[in-house]
Regions:
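Short catalytic/signature loops enriched in Gly
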Residues: 121-127, 215-276
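Conserved ABC ATPase signature
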Residues: 129-134, 138
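Conserved ABC ATPase "signature" region
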Residues: 106-125
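A short, proline-enriched helix->beta-strand linker immediately N-terminal to the Walker B motif
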Residues: 149-153
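A short, surface-exposed alpha-helical micro-motif characterized by mixed small hydrophobic
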Residues: 197-199
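Conserved ABC transporter NBD signature motif
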Residues: 42-54
């Protein structure tokens, strides 16, 4: 699936890992924390080293000290990662209890501080909420807060803005940039969105069919790509120019004087008393 991949991330650096779906980006990220089932997954060659220590050959106890602690990960869909049966407070407290041994009383203040830092409004009130009560952007902010509670040295973000609308994407990217500078942490950012890469990355690694075909500084790669696949990838980036419309194009859909109302029901018999308009 991935073959002869070599890359490195410096302290405080953002490396964007880009490529089409199935190129091996997420598999690479999951391998950093040994989150792929082994067997069947194996690592015939190479190694992954964190501060010089092998992660591929580390025992489970060593990995527990790294996973979610010194290296944290944000996944693409927070509803899959957050437990729908537990409140935000319970899930965030579990992180501090497991990785930092904090008691609930001491943890609450740190949880509130972290939620406010990532832009969750009315944080004390939201602690009792369940994941389904949050918007998509709020859930992703909670995932970022959960990752940052342990003050990681490296944050892996796997397509963290894919399911969000453009305005929320911009907020999340700004937040990640600010937090990276504040904490001086490394960031491995996985995406297929080249416009995001331009905004966020210091360096870019391009993957194709499980191989890294090109690595370079962000500005250098966008201005002078060397590998044919990288050039095709950049050429596929939308220009933003709309397709010209023929002046005599027939009308496909029209709405005229449309109103939409929902009934307001009250009382024991749930009778309609008014409408929301």
């Amino acid at each position: 699936v991935v073959s002869e991949l070599s890359l490195q991330i410096a302290v405080g650096e953002t490396l964007a890992l880009v490529g089409e779906s199935g190129s091996g980006k997420s598999v690479t990220a999951l391998s950093v924390l040994r989150l792929l089932p082994s067997p069947p997954v194996s690592y015939p060659t190479g190694d992954i080293r964190f501060h010089g220590q092998s992660l591929l050959h580390a025992d489970e106890r060593t990995l527990r000290g790294v996973r979610g602690n010194r290296i944290a990960m944000i996944f693409q869909e927070p509803m899959v990662s957050l437990n729908p049966l537990h409140t935000l407070e319970k899930q965030l407290y579990e992180v501090l209890s497991l990785h930092r041994g904090m008691r609930k009383e001491a943890a609450r203040g740190e949880i509130l501080d972290c939620l406010e830092r990532v832009g969750i409004r009315n944080a004390p009130r939201r602690l009792a909420d369940y994941p389904h009560q949050l918007s998509g952007g709020e859930r992703q902010r909670v995932m970022i807060a959960m990752a940052l509670l342990t003050r990681p040295e490296l944050l892996i973000a796997d397509e963290p803005t894919t399911a969000l609308d453009v305005s929320v994407q911009a907020q999340i990217l700004t937040l990640l940039r600010e937090l990276k500078q504040e904490l001086n942490m490394g960031l491995l950012f996985i995406t297929h969105n080249l416009s995001i890469v331009r905004q966020l990355a210091d360096r870019v690694a391009v993957m194709q069919n499980g191989r890294c075909v090109e690595q370079n500084g962000c500005q250098a790669l966008f201005s002078a790509p060397e590998h044919p696949y990288t050039r095709r990838l950049l050429d596929s980036e939308p220009s933003g120019d709309p397709v010209p419309l023929a002046p005599d194009a027939p009308v496909l859909l029209r709405a005229e004087n449309l109103s939409i109302a929902f009934p307001i029901r009250k009382g024991l018999l749930r009778r309609v008393v008014d409408h929301n308009r």
